[in-house]
């Protein structure tokens, strides 16, 4: 069989027309949406969260994006000091971000322990406030 080039075909540019429901099925009250497609499959509760946990535990990237963090740093520094033009070196911002993320991850780990102690799996604001209170007491006892 000889090989030949195929020419481009014209398309109508739309979806194929839907089939009309027969009069019998229309009388039964079957909606076209329910009979047309199957129910969309969903993951079981918690499996997506576990997948995200595994992904973030594998990665070494920053959890907070760089530019929003940089803007937040600049706004905090502007509020604290009177200087109008403040510049940061890239490694300085990266080290501040690294330290902040380590602190926040530790805070949420301890808050999760508080939630488990209360026989819950959801972290509430009261868990975070408890962790902060316990940490401040620990710091005061060390400094005395």
From Swiss-Prot:
Pfam families given in the database record: Histone
GO molecular-function annotation terms? DNA binding; protein heterodimerization activity; structural constituent of chromatin
Q: Fetch the InterPro entries from UniProt.
A: Histone-fold, Histone_H2A/H2B/H3, Histone_H3/CENP-A
The primary site where this protein sits is nucleus
Question: In the UniProt record, does the keyword Cell inner membrane occur?
Answer: no
- Quick one: where's region Disordered? 1-45
Which family does the UniProt entry place this protein in?
A: Belongs to the histone H3 family.
Tell me the function of this protein.
Answer: Core component of nucleosome. Nucleosomes wrap and compact DNA into chromatin, limiting DNA accessibility to the cellular machineries which require DNA as a template. Histones thereby play a central role in transcription regulation, DNA repair, DNA replication and chromosomal stability. DNA accessibility is regulated via a complex set of post-translational modifications of histones, also called histone code, and nucleosome remodeling.
Q: What is this protein called?
A: Histone H3.1
